[in-house]
């Protein structure tokens, strides 16, 4: 298979500070990949290297089988790559039509083609005469996407394009953009620090930490079977407990819990997601006391201190509960574990 993008052993430093170390991954044509990580992990630098705005210190980058960095250099304007920045980077004194037309060859800057591009991103062609300051944040991002689509790129790079939008607008704009790119069958890479955004937007997720790719997989794999505790805690709320693993079971503060088969034995740490811990009122399973409640609308996060034997340090776990059943600090509850935990060597 010829990959749409291949990154192999890429390093990058600035002023003696190492930003990327041995980054390697490949992206299939027509797929969507999200690179997620905390601020400063190197994800935007990686995107800029792919776009051709920076040169790697080591390693190679290939687009559709052609090396464009390392062992040769192809400048950004000669790569078939679209790029949408965090703020959209529209020209403030130009109309929407002029902004979109900037991505087109001069002879192709016709009203009909600009209208077609605006319609692709669910904007009415009448928006062509407006200026960026007359648009909402979500509309500005869609104009930036239309401008990038005008070049008919083989690869689209999105650098945290939704982060400046409020929650409701962000979700709606994200859905529109994902739909546009899917219909156009354009290979897409999204960089974000927003974990739910990465999991919902892409078919594959790459978790970046301290300049390295910690794990690449489907959203379900990344969330359900993270490669280590740090990745588990970064990608979502996690309950991590000390345990002893033997014969597919982990003995921990939650009792004997089934664990996924991954070769871990003996003293270990186990991870569960809060939704895997069920609160009961029938006394089944372990028992504990509610110590705090975080109300989140359709769900709540409960902090529960587990009952322990004499001389043992009480463990506190976080439980996600859906529905409107009211619980308050001091309430006594039972706890039951659903599914399997993931075990990690100490």
From Swiss-Prot:
Keywords linked to the UniProt accession: ATP-binding, Cell membrane, Ion transport, Iron, Iron transport, Membrane, Nucleotide-binding, Plasmid, Translocase, Transport
Recorded hits in PROSITE patterns, A to Z, give: ABC_TRANSPORTER_1, ABC_TRANSPORTER_2, FBPC
- The superkingdom listed in its UniProt entry is Bacteria
Q: Where in the cell is it found?
A: Cell membrane
CDD domains recorded for this chain?
ABC_Carb_Solutes_like
* Matches recorded under Gene3D superfamilies: 2.40.50.450, P-loop containing nucleotide triphosphate hydrolases (3.40.50.300)
Class of enzymatic activity (EC top level): translocase
Where ATP binds, per the record, is at: 37-44
Whether Isomerase counts among this entry's keywords is: no
Query: What catalytic activity does the UniProt entry give for this protein?
Result: Fe(3+)(out) + ATP + H2O = Fe(3+)(in) + ADP + phosphate + H(+)
Subunit details: The complex is composed of two ATP-binding proteins (FbpC), two transmembrane proteins (FbpB) and a solute-binding protein (FbpA).
Per its record, how is this protein called by name? Fe(3+) ions import ATP-binding protein FbpC 3
One GO CC term, this protein:
ATP-binding cassette (ABC) transporter complex
Q: What does this protein do?
A: Part of the ABC transporter complex FbpABC involved in Fe(3+) ions import. Responsible for energy coupling to the transport system.
UniProt lists the family membership as follows:
Belongs to the ABC transporter superfamily. Fe(3+) ion importer (TC 3.A.1.10) family.
Cross-referenced SUPFAM superfamilies: MOP-like, P-loop containing nucleoside triphosphate hydrolases
Could you tell me which residue ranges the ABC transporter domain spans? 5-235
EC number(s) given by UniProt = 7.2.2.7
Single GO molecular function: ATP hydrolysis activity
Classify the main location. Answer: membrane
Topology versus the membrane = Peripheral membrane protein
């Amino acid at each position: 298979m010829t990959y749409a993008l291949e990154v192999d052993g890429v390093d990058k430093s600035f002023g003696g500070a190492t930003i990327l170390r041995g980054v390697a991954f490949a992206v299939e044509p027509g797929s969507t990949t999200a690179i997620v990580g905390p601020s400063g992990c190197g994800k935007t630098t990686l995107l800029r290297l792919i776009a051709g705005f920076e040169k790697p210190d080591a390693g190679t980058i290939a687009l559709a089988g052609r090396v464009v960095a390392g062992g040769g250099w192809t400048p950004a304007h000669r790569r078939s790559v679209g790029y949408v920045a965090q703020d959209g980077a529209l020209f403030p004194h130009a109309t929407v039509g002029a902004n979109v037309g900037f991505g087109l060859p001069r002879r192709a800057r016709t009203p009909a083609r600009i209208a077609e591009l605006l319609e692709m991103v669910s904007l009415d062609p009448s928006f062509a005469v407006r200026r960026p300051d007359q648009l909402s944040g979500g509309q500005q991002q869609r104009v930036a996407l239309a401008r990038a689509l005008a070049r008919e790129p083989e690869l689209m790079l999105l650098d945290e394009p939704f982060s400046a939008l409020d929650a409701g607008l962000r979700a709606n704009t994200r859905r529109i953009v994902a739909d546009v790119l899917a219909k156009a069958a354009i290979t897409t890479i999204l960089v974000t620090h927003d974990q739910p955004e990465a999991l919902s937007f892409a078919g594959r997720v790459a978790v970046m930490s301290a300049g390295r790719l910690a794990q690449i997989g489907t959203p379900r794999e990344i969330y359900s079977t993270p490669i280590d505790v740090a990745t588990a805690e970064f990608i979502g709320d996690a309950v991590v407990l000390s345990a002893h693993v033997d014969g597919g079971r982990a003995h921990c503060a939650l009792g004997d819990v089934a664990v996924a088969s991954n070769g871990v034995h003996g003293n270990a740490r186990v991870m569960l997601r809060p939704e895997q811990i069920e609160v009961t009122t029938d006394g089944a399973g372990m028992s504990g006391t509610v110590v705090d409640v975080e109300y989140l609308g359709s769900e709540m996060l409960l902090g529960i201190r587990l009952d322990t034997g004499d001389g043992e340090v009480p463990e506190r776990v976080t439980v996600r509960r859906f529905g409107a059943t009211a619980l308050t600090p001091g309430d006594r509850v039972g706890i039951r574990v659903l599914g399997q935990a993931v075990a990690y060597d100490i």
